Amino acid sequence: MNHIEQLHEGVSVRGLKKLTAAALGALALMSAAPAMADVIDFESIGSATYNGTEQFGEYGYTMQVIDSAASQTGLGFAGAVGNGEDPFLCAIAACPVGNSSYYYMGVNDGGLKISRDDHKTFSLQTLQYAFLPPVSGLPPDSYGMLTVLGKTATGGTAVANFRFPVLNSTGNSPFRTAGLAAAFGNIQFTNVTISSCLWDDGGACINPAGNQAQFALDNLTLTPVPEPETYAMMGLGLAAVGLMSRRRSNKPQANA
């Protein structure tokens, strides 16, 4: 190999090393940095009431209120967004404590279905929840569970249940944070439905429950699927590495 060939070979090798390092560095960053999470906190909604089938949205997600399965029309009062600082929020029911912000209330055995506006999939990481007793003054106990049911793009389902916190001495429920990693991992859902159930005398958790299965919900952390363009950019970088490698291997070898 003469001096000129050695020079070209050195430039090619250095270029390949730089491009490989850049592509692998980008891949490492993509692997280390998760997609940006969205937090639904209901702050932009304000105080509102909803009947079954009604919808509202926040931060690129659509929430559809679901009436009780016992409802004949599916259009009954089943949800509301309220301000925890409002002293008149709960005239009969016992509002949760420890939350001075806006939060969602599923009432009268109702539920809430969540999906993305762009119909893409997402994972659910955490949420805060509480029991919404239908009347005040209930003795301290856990009266049921929150149910989280996710539907995947292939039509499968995954479900997780979380016991309601024990009521305090005044009959109000504190909020509790539910981590969903153990139940769902990074499963991608097309939609998630959140509802509640109450224990019956036989120990089963039931819904419908005479319009008494009610819950409060706040600060849902959701992570959308990364945009396809992200993977495309990484693929282009790795393809360029492969191209340079092939060009180098196909180059005629000089005689010594």
Model feature map: region roles:
Residues 227-246:
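A short, hydrophobic C-terminal helix/tail in secreted or cell-surface proteins
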Residues 243-256:
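C-terminal membrane-anchoring or membrane-association module
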Residues 40, 44-46, 51, 60, ...:
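Terminal, low-complexity interaction segments
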Residues 130-143:
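Extended, low-complexity, turn-rich repeat/linker tracts enriched in Gly/Pro/Ser/Thr and Asp/Glu
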Residues 38-115, 119:
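N-terminal targeting leaders for non-cytosolic proteins
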Residues 119-126:
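Extended extracellular/luminal ectodomain segments enriched in beta-structured repeat modules
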Residues 4-22:
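Bacterial N-terminal signal peptides that target proteins for export
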